[in-house]
Amino acid sequence: MLARSRLPIALLLLFSATAFKPSTPPRQRSAILISWDGALREHVNDCLKRNQMPNLAQLIREGRMVDIDVSDHVTDTRAGHAQMLTGYDPSVTGVVSNAVFRPIPLGLSIFERLQQAFGKKDIATIMVTGKAMGLGPGGPKISAATEAASPNQASDEDEKQTRRVEKMRLAGEQNVQGQPFHLTKGTLTAWDGDMPRDARGVGQKALAMIDKFGPKGRFFLFLHFGDVDVNGHKYGEGSREYNDALVTLDTWLGRMVAQLKTDGLYDHTAVYITADHGFDVGTTHHSKATHIFLASNDAQVTSAGEQRDITPTVLQAMGVDIGKITPTLPGKSLRK
């Protein structure tokens, strides 16, 4: 039987003590967007049914959880996060896959849209990640190394994963323009994504960022947790390790909400949780992993949609007139 996550009673009571207030004017709201890398929608739903994710369940009770599909790009880290954090397709961002990418053009990210709408001095934009490869800010590099062999040629799962990581690394080294967020990094108020971190590392950074920027005014914080994806590649979707990683992320969600409440921020901070891609059921890869989700304490999120809808949803919740954005966002807000 899979182990259940347990939080101190005091923490659970704190979680239920206050709630996000939809009546807060949009231009007074802050927001946190969390990516659970590789979190398959069906597996998350199974965890909820087993009562293994009490903090996510509480968030959903306050707001909503809707189905999100990836429909127009490769289901991997670079392509998924490029669309999640811009709302645009690969034809605009230039981020096609983990192997084919360029820096996202300046001005297109959700961070920059918020700055354009409200001014850099009036909203802090923050990014904390758990992967250096795929979400790192690396600049142009050229490597003479040849591409790693296809993972399908590997003899076992450990070897496949080693080759996947090597292939991704070499793609980054051979890229003559830079990583997807190479240009975006310089526009942010704070960035911490230059090294791999587990949930504890990202979670502790998240608490520190909330404590630092929350009391000063409005903020938008993006957090990337890579643990589910890492365990999925190593042990497979459906494994105890994959499941335990999800339970761990739920624990950190509870701690972040508790910090928001301690700092008096939660009633005007919308929290959104999603994924860059899911996982192919029972496998160690995500080649056709289109099933993800969007969970939030924002009860106005009512419609299922696509990954390209996440950026306009968050922007609208924070008071941005998404109809005035150029180039026109291909997605729509999922809020009523």
Describe the predicted segments one by one.
Residues 21-336:
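Feature captures the catalytic ectodomains and active-site-proximal regions of enzymes
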